Amino acid sequence: MIYKVFDDMAQCCSAEIMRLKGCVSAQRLEQAMQYSHMFGQYCCLKSYEMLLELLNQMRSTPDKIENVEFQYNEYGAPYLLHGPYFSISHCKAGIAVAVSENPVGIDIEAVRTLKEELVRKTMNETEQQSILVDTNPDWAFIRLWTKKEAYLKMKGTGIISDLKSTLNNADDAKMTTYDCVEQQYVVTIVEQQ
């Protein structure tokens, strides 16, 4: 499995979007232009460029992949017809992409002020307690949230079920979480074992 995180979001500008438009498939360009704001367009285009970089790193031949077309499963999750597995995530703090021969999920989230109602809706009792006793509950919540979202992405379903029980049976996955304190975000990568 390989992954890449990009967090120089100051590069989001109209000139960079124009450059990226020339590097993506027609399908991805159409998806990017569905965003009404420049930031969404940038993240959509930049994540595609990052995906191509990672796919080319994984190849055993010198032929470069110039573009890929996504297929979509019944839940709307994108996949590549002939593999490998991939996952893309973005937030205001950055963009994260993972590629693997096994099902993989990645999530990046900016750390923000904890909302108790959201904690009650998304975390089970044990998770809620671990957040409350943590010296930094905002970070503790985001760590758990990214684990849940990355796990569901690995499963290919997205958020379709009770989030409180998401990690109860996650023994089939390896989870790795990174905190970027300087840029104020958390990234979790989950790969099926």
Predicted regions and their residues:
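Core catalytic alpha/beta fold that binds nucleotide/phospho-ligands
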Residues: 1-193
